[in-house]
Amino acid sequence: MQNRNTYEWTKKMTRLISVLVMIHIITRTSISNAYPIFAQQGYENPREATGRIVCANCHLAKKPVDIEVPQSVLPNTVFEAIVKIPYDTQMKQVLANGKKGALNVGAVLILPEGFELAPPDRISPEIRQKTGNLYFQNYRPNQKNIIVIGPVPGQKYSELVFPILSPDPATDKEAHFLKYPIYVGGNRGRGQIYPDGSKSNNTVYSASATGRVSKILRKEKGGYEITIDNKSDGGQVVDIVPPGPELLISEGELIKVDQPLTNNPNMGGFGQGDAEIVLQDPLRVKGLLLFLASVILAQIFLVLKKKQFEKVQLAEMNL
């Protein structure tokens, strides 16, 4: 009986711990690491009419990103799209709780219509090894040509390999043998602004009024309440600084409106780029190969004919 009670207690505790772990993962992801989710929730299309990728609305710092794709691909073929997000992996960023931690990365890949993420059974072992344990998803269930990834650890995945399947015009009437553009956006680190317009703790905080700093209160859970004696109306203004940024001002200091109260803790940033890829017609490739073969054969026959002519000339001279 006692063994049975112990078993039931252990079973309940295991369930409780599992639930707590899941809650922690969900809340931590949604607060500090969920930048692809923010874009998916807020925008029908990640690329605006101006060509700007919407991730730049939250990630204000501009950083480089690069994409490598083959110059051309055949229909119904799996190929690699490599997105490179370079940064110093030794850097630490401010997390949502104000502590320092490693940077994570994410990317959105906007392919031409008809191109999509390769199904698992079409991915070769070589490409599978390069993609690692990455989990790719479509931006929308009906937008298979737009793929998002992240957040993932930047120290391990500063180079992301997307396995892509090209369309086949023989079965897809919307696909054509043309040159197509591919767009990519990639970021490292957390954003500075949330989709609702509020600031994260990964950005600089500025004074909302001109006056003297009369009080700086350090909050119990981190962050500051800064009281400013407003010079214009004689009242007081309280600016809230969350945990993370470091103060640049002190009590008694005269400050101006929009003057930075803190440093800028952001270590990351967003970048976007593009590339071109040609969906090549196999018949055109075969035709080109036949043409090249005919040119080579013509050259060989010309050389042989020339040698034969030289032999005839030499024989006539000897007569």
Curated annotation (Swiss-Prot):
User: What membrane topology term does the record carry?
Assistant: Single-pass membrane protein
Record-listed heme binding positions: 35, 55, 58-59
Q: How is the cofactor bound?
A: Binds 1 heme group covalently.
- Write the record's keywords in alphabetical order, separated by commas: Chloroplast, Electron transport, Heme, Iron, Membrane, Metal-binding, Photosynthesis, Plastid, Signal, Thylakoid, Transmembrane, Transmembrane helix, Transport
Provide an example Pfam family for this protein: Apocytochr_F_N
Q: Where in the cell is it found?
A: Plastid, Chloroplast thylakoid membrane
Does this entry carry the keyword Chaperone? no
State any GO BP term from the record: photosynthesis
UniProt xrefs under PROSITE patterns = CYTF
Q: Which residues cross the membrane?
A: 285-305
- Mind listing the GO molecular function terms for this protein? electron transfer activity; heme binding; iron ion binding
**Annotated Gene Ontology cellular component terms:** chloroplast thylakoid membrane
What are the names of the required cofactors?
heme
Position of the signal peptide: 1-34
Known function: Component of the cytochrome b6-f complex, which mediates electron transfer between photosystem II (PSII) and photosystem I (PSI), cyclic electron flow around PSI, and state transitions.
Q: Which family does it belong to?
A: Belongs to the cytochrome f family.
- Summarize subunit and interaction data from the UniProt record for this chain: The 4 large subunits of the cytochrome b6-f complex are cytochrome b6, subunit IV (17 kDa polypeptide, petD), cytochrome f and the Rieske protein, while the 4 small subunits are PetG, PetL, PetM and PetN. The complex functions as a dimer.
* Name by which UniProt lists this protein: Cytochrome f
Q: Which organism is it from?
A: Pinus koraiensis (Korean pine)
